[in-house]
Each structure stands twice: as C-alpha cells, then as structure tokens.
UniProtKB/Swiss-Prot annotation:
The basic functional RuBisCO is composed of a large chain homodimer in a 'head-to-tail' conformation. In form I RuBisCO this homodimer is arranged in a barrel-like tetramer with the small subunits forming a tetrameric 'cap' on each end of the 'barrel'. It comes from Larix laricina. One of its GO terms (molecular function) is ribulose-bisphosphate carboxylase activity. This is Ribulose bisphosphate carboxylase small subunit, chloroplastic. It is found in: Plastid, Chloroplast. Residues 1-66 form a transit peptide.
Length: 189
C-alpha cells in the first residue's frame, strides 16, 4: 500500500517537473548586471519615520560601482602588510620589530632578488613557485632587542643589495606566521 502511494506521488512529481510552462521559458535567469542603485527602492516619503531614519544612517555604493578601478599589477610590486606605504624610516622599522618582539614572536629574515610569484617548474603551487624566499641565516630564537634584528637586516642588505628583504614573525606556540613586512627594497624599485 505504502509503495503504491510512493509510486503515484513520484510519478506526479516527475510529470509536474516535465510539464512545459505555459508562459514560455520561465526558469531562465537574467544575467547579472551589477549592483543596483537605491533609486528602485521605496523613497522616504512612503516609509515611516523609523524607515527614513534608517535610510539616512546607511550608505550605498550603488551609484559608484562603475567608478571602481583595479590596482595596476604591472611594474607595481606589492608584497606584504606595509608594502603599499612609502619605505619605512629606521624609527618606524624599530617600532615594527619591537611590536613583533613584544608579542613573543620569533623574527626571521628572508630575501629574494625577483620577489615575484612565478610557476616555472609546473602549474600547481609548490615550493618553487616564488612564495618561499631564501632564509637569511636561522630564525632568531631568543632575540630580545630590535637592534639585533636591524643589524641582521643591514648585513643582509650589504650581502644582497639587489634583493627584497622581509622580516617574518613566527609564533612558535601556535606554529604560524603572524606578521611579515618588507624592510628593504632594491634601489631600482
């Protein structure tokens, strides 16, 4: 009995799905045309006072969507946290490294002459795709002063003047990289 009811209900469902629509092609979705402006929503004249207050407090970028631009990726290398800013002064570098040490992160230096992510040896991401830079010496376990880190930065910059140098802060308890920022750029960049 139950199986015959199941058979009847399943054939009815298939028939309903297979039946053509009388209004034409009603299941076609229109193409995405971007964000809409607030003009098609009800105006504050028809809304209550609470709705008008809410409308005044909110913002919409609907009218500005066509003004958005993409950051130019060519001849404009941007890397880590502070790379969009001008070069950091020595005082700013000291503050960044002190912040790293205050959080008990282990500083480490890495350098790379090209600095671009490139996949030369295959299409899949891996060790040789440019994300992993060469480590300068060993991570500075037990480092307590920013001057120690900056001395290593200066040594690395003397040895490799045409390289990008970044400081990385590792949390050895959680075993993750917590901070990374460029401390030296080649003169041509």
């Amino acid at each position: 009995m139950a199986s015959s009811i199941m058979a009847l209900s399943s054939t009815a469902a298939v028939a309903a799905v297979a039946a053509p629509s009388k209004t034409g092609n009603s299941n076609v979705v229109s193409a995405f045309t971007g964000l809409k402006s607030m003009a098609q929503f009800p105006s504050s004249k028809t809304m209550s006072n609470a709705g008008a207050e809410w409308e005044q407090k909110t913002t919409s970028n609907g009218s500005r969507v066509r003004c958005m631009q993409v950051w130019p990726p060519y001849a404009n290398k941007k890397f880590e946290t502070l790379s969009y800013l001008p070069r950091l002064t020595p005082e700013q570098l000291v503050k960044e490294v002190e912040y790293l040490l205050k959080n008990k992160w282990v500083p480490c230096l890495e350098f790379e002459e090209d600095g671009e992510i490139k996949r030369v040896y295959g299409n899949s991401p891996g060790y040789y795709d440019g994300r992993y830079w060469v480590m300068w010496k060993l991570p500075m376990f037990g480092c307590t002063e920013a001057s120690q880190v900056l001395n290593e930065v200066n040594e690395c910059a003397k040895a490799y003047p045409n390289a990008f140098i970044r400081v990385i802060g590792f949390d050895n308890v959680r075993q993750v990289q917590c901070i990374s920022f460029i401390v030296h750029k080649p003169e041509y960049n």
